[in-house]
């Protein structure tokens, strides 16, 4: 029992408790607030410790800059006496949400890095934590379904199927499956479970990213396996047959999924093209060079066109200008450099390269830098901490 009572497991358990708000306890209440405060204190402590104690890889150095810049913008937003209100609404948007979402997304990477350096976070514990995270993500999925159904009923709609953003959280569980390489049968069972929920979520971006991750996962597990290649081929064949059968059945029995596929084939981006076009016109028509370089301030997209960008790059361009874009490009370049240094280690290379792809692709279809889950933090923290080459 004692070996499970360490700061790492307690930290991840607290994240699971936080994710379960609205399922086992009320959202936004005392429990969730106290849990988040405790998590931020622990995360902040390890952010400082990692930077003081260790010679960190290039990605974390760039991440330091990114977090620092976003903190400055977040503080300026909080100090602004004017309320944050959308262009076409009188509803106020929480100013605290901007910096809170970034801290929740990015600070856990440092904690996982420190836990690995200290020898607390090991593959055996990651395997157990993977199961816990799959369970909590599944519960979150059904909570989101119930909330969407309730809103539809309140609006007088008879709609019973919805897109579910939890599909992106399932997507971020993918890299953790590489840690199960010595248990291929269970590994592929978990793979099937995760991908099923990605499809059920009906987020087209998540499904497309998931398909690429699926191909990469199969390729890397086959290439890195020396003694179980026949089993890998067999499991892959079973997965393909079952997957195709499931997709056909799901398509035939889900009118909403058919509608989403038809939208994709017709090039319908759910209004994203209009949003991006409006944001681009807003940016190029700015007269102030300061706004072009440094942006208009945190969360400015909602005051500029009435909605958030749903795309990291346009959100940064409008809010943090060329400064934000430049740092974000460096963010991905530095992570790619760390990926290349892992080529001599099959496990680390497979995990880190998939993390890079998920993060970058998500930044194009949705939001990434403020939406990373503890799953990605575990994968990044563990592999970056186990760097076995020079920085």
Regions found by a protein language model. Name each.
Residues 1-78, 181-185, 228, 341, ...:
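Transmembrane signal-anchor hairpin modules in multi-pass inner-membrane enzymes, especially those
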Residues 15-28, 320, 349-389:
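Membrane helix-loop boundary segments at the extracytoplasmic
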Residues 106-108, 118-148, 161-220:
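Alpha-helical transmembrane segments of multi-pass inner-membrane proteins
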């Amino acid at each position: 029992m004692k070996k499970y009572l360490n700061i790492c497991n307690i930290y991840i358990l607290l994240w699971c408790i936080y994710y379960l708000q609205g399922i086992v306890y009320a959202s936004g209440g005392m429990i969730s607030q106290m849990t988040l405060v405790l998590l931020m204190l622990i995360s902040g402590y390890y952010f400082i410790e990692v930077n003081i104690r260790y010679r960190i890889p290039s990605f974390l150095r760039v991440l330091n800059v990114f977090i620092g810049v976003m903190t400055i913008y977040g503080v300026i937003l909080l100090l602004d006496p004017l309320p944050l209100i959308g262009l076409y609404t009188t509803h106020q948007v929480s100013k605290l949400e901007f910096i809170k979402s970034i801290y929740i997304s990015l600070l856990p990477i440092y904690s996982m890095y420190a836990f690995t350096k200290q020898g607390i976070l090991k593959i055996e514990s990651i395997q157990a934590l993977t199961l816990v995270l799959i369970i909590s993500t599944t519960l979150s999925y059904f909570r989101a379904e119930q909330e969407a159904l309730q809103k539809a009923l309140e609006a007088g709609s008879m709609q019973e199927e919805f897109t579910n953003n939890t599909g992106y959280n399932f997507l971020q569980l993918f890299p953790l499956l590489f840690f199960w390489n010595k248990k291929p049968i269970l590994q592929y069972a978990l793979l099937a479970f995760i991908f099923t929920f990605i499809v059920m979520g009906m987020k087209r971006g998540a499904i497309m990213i998931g398909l690429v991750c699926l191909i990469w996962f199969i390729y890397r597990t086959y290439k890195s396996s020396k003694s179980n290649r026949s089993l890998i081929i067999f499991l892959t064949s079973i997965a393909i047959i079952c997957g195709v059968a499931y997709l056909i059945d799901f398509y035939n029995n889900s009118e909403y999924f058919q509608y989403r596929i038809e939208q994709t084939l017709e090039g319908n981006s759910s209004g994203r093209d209009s949003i991006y076009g409006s944001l681009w016109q807003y940016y190029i028509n700015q007269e102030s060079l300061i706004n072009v370089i440094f942006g208009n301030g945190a969360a400015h997209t909602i005051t500029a066109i009435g909605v958030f960008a749903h795309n990291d790059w346009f959100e940064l361009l409008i809010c943090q200008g060329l400064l934000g874009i430049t740092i974000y490009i460096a963010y991905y370049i530095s992570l790619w450099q760390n990926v290349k240094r892992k080529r001599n280690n099959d496990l680390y290379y497979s995990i880190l390269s998939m993390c890079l792809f998920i993060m970058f692709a998500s930044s194009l279809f949705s939001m990434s830098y403020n939406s990373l889950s503890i799953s990605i933090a575990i994968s990044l923290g563990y592999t970056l901490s186990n760097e076995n080459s020079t920085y």
